[in-house]
Regions:
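Short beta-strand->loop
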Residues: 52, 64, 106-108, 167
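Conserved RNase H-like, two-metal-ion catalytic cores of nucleic-acid enzymes
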Residues: 31-101
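N-terminal accessory regions of nucleic-acid-interacting proteins
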Residues: 1-40
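Short hydrophobic "helix-edge" motifs at membrane interfaces and signal-peptide entry regions
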Residues: 37-38, 128, 192-193
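Acidic active-site catalytic centers that drive phospho-/nucleotidyl reactions
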Residues: 47-49, 114, 138, 203
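Conserved DEDDh/DEDDy metal-dependent 3′-5′ exonuclease domain
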Residues: 74-163
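Short, function-defining helix-loop hinge/capping sites that tune catalysis or transport
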Residues: 55-57, 117, 146, 211
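Acidic, Mg2+-coordinating catalytic module of metal-dependent nucleases/exonucleases
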Residues: 156-219
Length: 219
C-alpha cells in the first residue's frame, strides 16, 4: 500500500507534525548573504523525487516533499506522491496551494535542479508557475563556501553527518528512486516506494537542521 490519503485520483498525501529544531521567530540569513532575516513560518523546505537525475523535459517529479514550521514552532512535513502518470497535474496544483507570495523556498541544489524541473512541468501542464518571484535559499552554496576542500564532498548526506550527526541506516539512495516508482507503476511492490518516502522525509528534516546550523553558527 502507498502511505497517505488519496486526495485526487492517483495522488496521495502524507502529513505529519513533529518537534524538529527550535527556530527563533526570525531566522538569520546572513550566511546566504541576505540582508534581512526571515520569519521561520515563511520558510518552505522542499525536495523532489523524479524519474531521472538528468533533468530536461523528459524528466518528471513523481513526488514533492515540503516541510515548514508553523507559527507555534511545530514542524509540518507533507509529501505528495503520484501513483499514475495522470496525477501529475493534481500534484502540481496542490503544491502551488502551499505557496504564498512571501514564501521563501529552502532547498539543496534546488536552484539548479528541483526548481527548474518543476517550472518545466508547470509549463508543460499549462499551469501558472507558482515558483517565479519567490525567494530561494539554496543551502548547497553556503555549505560549499564553508566546507569545500574540508569535507570529502558537499552532498546533503555529508552535510547532515558532519553538522547534525545523522547517519542513515537502510536508506534507499536517491538514485534508486526512479526504479522504485516505475516498479510500482508496473504492478510491483510498494516496499521501495515507502523507503523513498522515508528517504525524502530525512532529506527535509536535514534541510531544516542544516539551515538552523548555518543560521546559528558564528561567522
Amino acid at each position: 500500500m502507498v502511505p497517505g490519503v488519496e486526495i485526487a485520483p492517483g495522488l496521495f498525501l502524507t502529513e505529519a507534525l513533529m518537534d524538529w529544531g527550535r527556530p527563533a521567530p526570525l531566522i538569520d540569513t546572513a550566511f546566504a548573504r541576505w540582508d534581512e532575516p526571515v520569519a521561520h513560518h515563511r520558510l518552505l523546505h522542499f525536495d523532489t523525487e523524479t524519474t531521472g537525475l538528468a533533468g530536461g523535459t523528459g524528466t518528471r517529479a513523481w513526488m514533492i516533499g515540503a516541510a515548514d514550521w508553523l507559527a507555534d514552532g511545530r514542524f509540518r512535513l507533507r509529501q505528495l506522491t503520484t501513483t499514475t502518470m495522470g496525477a501529475e497535474a493534481a500534484m502540481l496544483r496542490t503544491f502551488a496551494q502551499w505557496l504564498q507570495p512571501d514564501t521563501v523556498l529552502v532547498s539543496y541544489n534546488g536552484k539548479c535542479y528541483d526548481s527548474p524541473l518543476l517550472k518545466t512541468r508547470y509549463r508543460l501542464a499549462r499551469l501558472p508557475d507558482p515558483l517565479s518571484g519567490l525567494g530561494h535559499l539554496d543551502l548547497l552554496h553556503p555549505v560549499r563556501r564553508h566546507w569545500k576542500g574540508v569535507w570529502e564532498n558537499c552532498r546533503l548526506a555529508t552535510a547532515e553527518r558532519e553538522l547534525l550527526g545523522v547517519v542513515r541506516e537502510d536508506d534507499l539512495p536517491g538514485s534508486e528512486a526512479p526504479a522504485a516508482w516505475l516498479t510500482y507503476l508496473r504492478g510491483g511492490s510498494a516496499v521501495n516506494l515507502r523507503r523513498v518516502l522515508a528517504h525524502n522525509t530525512q532529506d527535509l528534516k536535514s534541510l531544516a537542521g542544516v539551515l538552523l546550523h548555518l543560521a546559528e553558527s558564528p561567522r
